[in-house]
């Protein structure tokens, strides 16, 4: 059914549009103007409201293709009182007459079975024209009879209309269109004033709250079809009780041949409801009207119905402010929590709006983004201020804590432990300092092993974790050591080591003194509130000056005890092993004096990943430091985005362990992937929980990376960005032997800045050998593969050679940085400068019909070459630039060049504007090196 507009309804009801708008507003329906459309249920309510108030001309709704009929007036104001009821009795089929008043006797009698909805077509006969009419007086209303709402046709086994059971006040019938959609008057019977019946009330058995028979199936109306007899026992309803009927119940009686064009009742309402003038129609789901003459569905579409929630939401949207052409419900300062890397779709789900509306608002604010694109915090803040929501981006720590709380895991559980459950644990000591100041040599001396020979260039490329036993006053004490790199590329790894440690040993060479990485190590330790023990190393070397080191460190807040401070200094020689035992005693004394190192070994293990790598035979191998609890073989663990079950545990010497207590470093086997160095690990209740936590972290990490990479495109800078040439990117695939080395190499490469014209993009990073997938990825993206302490097998190397993929191998990190920086400089677009090669004076002009003007010149300096660029200088002013020497002759011979002091003939192609005395200056564009 097409939607009616407000001015059409006003014209139909006989009132002005302002009255209709006021009425709609009073009904709770907010319409903008007289040209706005109104839903069919709302139009029906409007007609009922005008009919009940006696204002306007209430008429039935119009079916598609029907013209509006003159509305009926309530008969209760002028109709005579019906006669006394008479006993119901069967009557012969009634002849086609105008509609009669409905009566309760239309319902089936007790003991009679109500016919099924489909029986009317099979058993219904044409009405008999000899049936008597109900008694009633004649009356005129506005020159034509009025329709009687609620009246139903007389049926073969129903009591006659003259025997009404109660004092119903019927309406006089009005004409209805025929069943033929091509003729409006087929089957029409226009009654005369004498034909208007006067109904008589009669008793009606089996009445339920005054309601008539239940409606037929959807699309089948209660009114009788034109030319067919109604079903036996089909009841009507009392006028004034239409508000109690469901949609789909029968409507009024219809004369023979006067059925609705689309079937259903004569009221014209979908679902079989007529439009009474004395009661509002109820909503809800009914059985609908008849299917119509040509099988069209007469019932109301379920999509067109609106429940209260939809109307309330529509009302709220109408009150919402309009931004960029869309309505967004204002938040009034309410807080919305979003994770890092969230998209507009995530925000739309939180505030219950359409994501497309937020895209439009963001575009209105000058930024373009898709609904699923990750946005940064600044963009969300701008959007939140515009729509009235306080958008708060949850930090990674808070988000991870909320994630674990979903699985009943409390990270603050250890703080709630009772003192009786806590037991002493060994201190975790980090060895920090500048590169090549002897950190690894010191650990080598402590552990009595030789690990420095395995490090490329004598530089530690990864974090090592070891545990040693020290005798302090005859009592064995354990100390856990972490070795952090000293190279400047490993800033993140030093910071991570400071976060895991309890006491820091700062190694400073006595001959070098304080260096840049020494200051950085001090800052990391002080930021983590870690006590520092200074080891002044290399005191056995010539030129060593420990007092100079003490004086330099005083400037950074490390005052020795002999100077009145609280920092312990120990002069050692890691190579000779001098005073190493005193250094260990100083570490234990500092830990006992300043720290309360206790943990609960009976809880589930928690800790941090120190380093991780991919072993060819054992898979992912992670070195973890247990900080609290005890880790057992068979525990389900999750470390960052990796998860698995502990299959084996090894100590630093390769010995198998069954459990690992607090402050114990251990190698764990059994993870499905290689975790990142620094990821926290914890024990989950089962494998399923560990997998779900890891997968949720993977999704969060990916969204955060997308938000970090997102380039903000604003409308102001869009034209400028289009004008600029695209930046040439060097795509890189990084593979390394450990996660710490890969992380450090990536961070160092991303810091390289050569020019705005070139850049680096790491498209993939991973731990382990170079695989075929890496080569395929590099082939597609035209990338360079960097292998850090890893090599491909023969098949992968052959594939890379066939595909033309370059693989570079490095074992020292700064060598890789230098090569990549040189490659970026080679990618720069070349710059050119102009170099003048010769000057030639025109002394004669020869005119040729074939070649034009030919200049006879004398080469004054340099060398004139054919095909070079040139310009004309006249009185020292360049008249024409970007000419080309198309022909060069020496007498009658074509030559390629003419040197200084010789005469030549020069033709400049189609350019003939030359004069005697002009100078022809030749030049070349030579490429210069970019720096």
Curated annotation (Swiss-Prot):
Could you tell me which residue ranges the tr-type G domain spans? 424-596
- Indicate the principal place this protein occupies in or around the cell: cytoplasm
Give the span(s) annotated as G2: 458-462
User: What residue spans carry the Low complexity bias annotation?
Assistant: 156-168
Signal peptide start and end residues? none
Q: Does the keyword Protein biosynthesis apply?
A: yes
* Region G5: start-end pairs: 573-575
The protein in question is named: Translation initiation factor IF-2
What's the source species for this entry? Answer: Bifidobacterium adolescentis (strain ATCC 15703 / DSM 20083 / NCTC 11814 / E194a)
